[in-house]
């Protein structure tokens, strides 16, 4: 997946049925380093096949990576020597979003004959199918990013309102932030409880999100409350106070 600075490709999902490798997503952290799109001198990293596809937008279909010119597969050879694997055919397809911008690449290694199990080259039909899957994956990734960006925008808006409320009075400055932090701290401790009265209580990720938003918004009514009411040292309990408010 292309990072925000568009300077490198980071592995998002890695899976090998032959080697029994599953990394990324719900399968744990990926420890492989990212692929840089530029060389140290600033020139495009066309020697790496994934970087080439991301930079040019071209589909790369290689029958045998050990016998191809124009790309550097030294890292692939080292991996094969270490694991006993034999990387052969490779298909790299750029992933484009709705604006036709490249957001990542889909890389497949070693197509297999369904009848014999022999490693074969990726056929034109397989390439077309993979391009279609890459398009669907790009849509899913873009939608996920848009949702995260909307959530971040919403939270930023909430925190801006909270900051505006805190600025209204020196007596309540930082109150909303402290309440939000305390609320989430209590909720996390409750989730960690293994025994006692709260052992059966557990907040889901969505409930934790709702709780955090509620904590940030608990004083939202103060936005329109006059400063002389916010700063008042006593309760509004006399007839005079009620008439004036």
Positions of the model-derived regions?
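GAF sensory/regulatory domain recognition
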Residues: 1-44, 67-68, 106, 236-244
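Metal-dependent catalytic cores of enzymes that make or break cyclic nucleotides
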Residues: 37, 42, 58, 116-124, ...
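Signal-transducing coupling segments at domain and membrane junctions
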Residues: 46-50, 59, 63-89, 111-120
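Catalytic cores of nucleotide-enabled group-transfer and carboxylate-activating enzymes in metabolic
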Residues: 50-53, 61, 83, 97, ...
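Signal-transmission/dimerization alpha-helices at domain junctions
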Residues: 55-59, 105-106, 128-150, 164, ...
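A short, aliphatic-rich beta-strand micro-motif
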Residues: 88-97, 104
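Flexible loop/coil segments at beta-strand boundaries within sensory signal-transduction domains
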Residues: 96-102, 111-114
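Amphipathic alpha-helical "output/dimerization" segments
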Residues: 101, 116-142, 209
